[in-house]
């Protein structure tokens, strides 16, 4: 069964998928006929640096996109699909689009908790959503999305389902569907 630890309203917590035995409100998750025992994803934290601020004393808008990439790479590392390992297999994952909505300002020295989650995945493309909150107050700072595809080194689209089923399985396990 799937569920969240914490207050149930935010994703400030570990995302946990458990095998039978604990009653939770979310749907059962099966991955290619096998239940997932337990998956824990830590949120990514970023400590805002002075050089990331603009003339108004707040974090420049371009930095949020960089933070999203840092959080996505951390997520990939946690699920066992580091970019370095994928590139060694000659799989690249360029950004197709990115969007960011600013809800409240981040200042120098703030710590932002970034919770990325894979919301769409079909073996050829994926979409990641990001939620950034203040570590101390929990206030929502920013939300965003990025979409990506999978290409070989020649720049041709590849299907992970067909070419790399073990990688496809890992992506499927961590996709919120």
What does each model-found stretch correspond to?
Residues 25-78:
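Catalytic strand-loop segment that frames the active site of acyl-thioester-processing enzymes
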Residues 25-44, 107-108, 119-177:
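HotDog/MaoC-like acyl-thioester-processing domains
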Residues 60-61, 69, 99, 103, ...:
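Anionic, Ser/Thr-rich low-complexity intrinsically disordered regions
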Residues 75-126:
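Hydrophobic beta-strand-centered segment that forms part of the acyl-chain substrate-binding groove
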